[in-house]
Amino acid sequence: MDNGVQEGSVRLGEDAEAVLAGAVSTKANHRQVLSSLLSGALAGALAKTAVAPLDRTKIIFQVSSKRFSAKEAFRLLYFTYLNEGFLSLWRGNSATMVRVIPYAAIQFSAHEEYKRILGHYYGFRGEALPPWPRLLAGALAGTTAASLTYPLDLVRARMAVTPKEMYSNIFHVFIRISREEGLKTLYFGFTPTVLGVIPYAGLSFFTYESLKSLHREYSGRPQPYPFERMVFGACAGLIGQSASYPLDVVRRRMQTAGVTGHQHGSILSTLRSIVREEGAVRGLYKGLSMNWLKGPIAVGISFTTFDLMQILLRQLQS
């Protein structure tokens, strides 16, 4: 009788410990998700604000048939400043923030979760993932974020390429597009976006995580210095954006067709139109040199801010 009671007590104690451990683990996971969301939101906001004037200039060239050059790009920046004022260089940045903050928060948080899930699946729990799962985690994170925030990206592109008299604010863009072009217009360009995000996010996260792993292996230091993170992020941005750039041009043409005089069309028809009118290299890689300037800066700031915020929040929690 006593033995039965003792065994029952032991089992009850073990069950209680298991429930308590599960609750602690769940709480830690929730805290990690919130930490990733906050860090990602701040990282995206800082990075995009830093390069907003260059981003707006790139979009204007992407959606027009004007030939791109660095000289013409900076001339456009200068005349925009003269004619519309300094803050006009950030026109559309409020729409960018509305999109980028949730996009970056979701992307970074999803990346951490996909790393955890894939690490568990492939038996690398708590360790650096091997190359293929590392690439897959980045691609899945980017696809998840793009799918959930795409209409905001279209609104940002519309505000960037139109005069301020056309749309007074973000909500005005949504209302006019819905009334004049239909709700489905909010998803024009979605397919090339996802097709571009897969190599972009996959290669960006893969490159950054790989460089950090190599740094750990050869330097003997567990964490890179902030400027080293910036360099790793810059390399990641350069590789990721170069690989996905033609689809970015196609996406912008499809998003802004209703206000630039181009016809709405499929990916292939838009692609053929660009190549026919402007040539393959000149049309599909228009503004790439601008991206080589702004992309590494933005991605470097983004990845570095995320990592440093994660470190800071872990220290505060402990």
UniProtKB/Swiss-Prot annotation:
Looking at the UniProt record for this protein, which Gene Ontology cellular component terms does it annotate, in alphabetical order? mitochondrial inner membrane; mitochondrion
Q: Name one GO biological process term.
A: ADP transport
Q: Could you tell me which InterPro entries the record lists for this protein?
A: DNA_mismatch_repair_CS, Mit_carrier, Mitochondrial_sb/sol_carrier, Mt_carrier_dom_sf
Residue ranges of the Solcar repeats are: 31-117, 129-214, 224-312
Record membrane topology = Multi-pass membrane protein
The similarity annotation says:
Belongs to the mitochondrial carrier (TC 2.A.29) family.
Tell me the function of this protein. Answer: Mitochondrial carrier mediating the transport of coenzyme A (CoA) in mitochondria in exchange for intramitochondrial (deoxy)adenine nucleotides and adenosine 3',5'-diphosphate.
What PANTHER family is this protein classified in? SOLUTE CARRIER FAMILY 25
Q: What is this protein called?
A: Mitochondrial coenzyme A transporter SLC25A42
Organism expressing this protein natively: Rattus norvegicus
Q: Per UniProt, what is the name of the gene that codes for the protein in this document?
A: Slc25a42
